[in-house]
């Protein structure tokens, strides 16, 4: 509905109604005074024209450099290591026997619950949980930085042991404790849907609420190394 009637919205008025005047003002003034104003998609170019009153000078390609993906044997080695670690984390959290051929799915980005489609991702995994035609296990990861209080010590100890586990931890959906456990959008949605990684759930969901810089205390791999372990990455952002 927003984009169908985008032409009818006034950016200044909407910012006032949504109590976002400061943020909107900085963005608008920047757009009007920079030497070159760009964006990375036609739809965000429309937003700029209608909401910031400033057409972009150029729409740039949105992608990665060619060397983003490791080549040949390096790719295979890194992918295998990432998959093994992701499956180990899932087992250590849930106590379930995660098969080697499990489908690993993830979404990531800024913690904008609706704007980045995190709500859609969770709902999709929940529907898949009840799909009787599902032939293999699915392990889904939400990798968005939240208000992290620190890595879960009991999870780190399980991972350090190198063992496989058949009993779950408390809160078997979360890798790092949060300061706002009762107010976190992802955790609240999982509670509402009853997604708690039960033993008989064919779809397991793991929330990783930290920056993946290689030293988070649980995954300890950079995002660009870890993402190689996925079979599918999903980015259902509202604005795209």
Give each language-model segment a name.
Residues 1-240:
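Catalytic cores of nucleotide-sugar-dependent glycosyltransferases that transfer UDP/GDP/TDP-activated
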